[in-house]
Amino acid sequence: PYRWYLKYIKKFHGKDMFFSSYGTFMHKLIELYHKGEKTPRQLVDMYLQDFKTEVVGRAPNRKVFSSYFTGGLQYLKTLQPFPYDVVGVEKKVDFVVNGIPFVGYIDFLGRKDDDLYVVDNKSRILKPRSSRAKPTKADEELDAYLRQLYIYSAAVEEEYGKTPKSLCFN
């Protein structure tokens, strides 16, 4: 998405806002889990202790704040390992597509039975496609997330010589 482009390609780091700092905080916690450094219980404790200092900016309203806070807490309480061996967590990839340089961070790259899997952690629930003739904002957002996964698959193919078997959201 555009925010990813600004952050990783243009190296623009604007003022942290609620949604971006929430996503950054959740990714940091999930990374600790997949690297084997923290248990879900430890992550819950960190979440409760650090939420106020890590998640800056204001949510649009109390309902949104409550939804994100409780959703993140529930997510961390129910974390399960992926059915893949770990190849990389927050794996940095530098690559070129059609002459355009990209830098990205694959949330989780796994291997099972010699196949590769790219997993993109989402710290909130994604809405399914609407099937409307004219795409909704949620449809366009989902398309942007999917494009990011396909771009990452190009980086994986460049480095490992094979395309991932699956591109997944978690």
Explain the meaning of each model-derived region.
Residues 1-36, 90:
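Nuclease catalytic cores
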Residues 25-92, 96:
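A non-catalytic, helix-rich entry segment at domain boundaries
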Residues 16, 57-62, 135-142:
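Active-site oxyanion-binding pockets that recognize sulfate/phosphate
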Residues 1-13, 46-55, 118, 126-134:
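Short amphipathic alpha-helical segments and their helix-coil junctions
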Residues 4-7, 28, 32, 74, ...:
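Residue-level signal for well-ordered alpha-helical scaffold segments within enzymatic catalytic domains
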Residues 21-25, 67, 144-147, 151:
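Generic recognition of stable, solvent-exposed alpha-helical segments in well-folded globular domains
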Residues 87, 91-170:
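Mg2+/Mn2+-dependent nuclease catalytic core
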